[in-house]
Regions:
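Strongly charged
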Residues: 2-33, 37, 45-159
């Protein structure tokens, strides 16, 4: 096991516009090839799109973002466990950090899968839908929950 450097929670700087560490981590997840400024531009433009759509409502883009992340977070997932030569899909609780990571991944995956529009528009739309409990990321979460529900019989194998 390596004893190398690991980035800690405290070292993550909040993003410059909204002063939010969760958003900063989301930007890092969106980033490709170390191009952080491009990722920031995409997220901030997506937030501008959201603000345009909200128009008269009292919610802000950052509120929509937080609500979307909260809605997409899974509570349970299935993990493979080998017992006596057979692999079982065992439902398990998801740890808080993994919940957040999965939510980020699913939202970005949903936004990237829809082609034909600029990324900031796709991301803005996906965040809006997720905040209303709709969209592809929510479908992924529901599918994960259904899978866990279907394999409830193997819950006693949890470690």
């Amino acid at each position: 096991m390596g004893r190398g450097f690991t980035a800690s929670e405290e070292q993550l700087k909040p993003d410059p516009r909204y002063d939010d560490k969760v958003l900063s981590r989301f930007i890092n997840c969106l980033m490709k090839d170390g191009k952080k400024s491009v990722a920031q531009r995409v997220v901030y433009r997506a937030f501008d799109e959201i603000d345009k759509r909200l128009d008269g409502e009292e919610m802000t883009a950052i509120d929509v973002f937080r609500q979307a992340i909260e809605n997409v977070k899974p509570n349970v997932e299935v993990r493979s466990k080998r017992v006596g030569g057979a692999n079982y899909q065992v439902p398990m609780q998801v740890k808080p950090k993994r919940k957040q990571a999965l939510a980020f991944r699913w939202i970005l995956q949903a936004a990237r899968s829809e082609k034909g529009k600029p990324m900031h528009m796709r991301l803005g739309r996906e965040l809006m839908e997720a905040s209303r409990n709709e969209g592809r990321a929510i479908n992924t979460r529901d599918q994960t929950h259904r899978m866990a529900e279907a394999n409830k019989a193997f819950a006693h194998f949890a470690w």
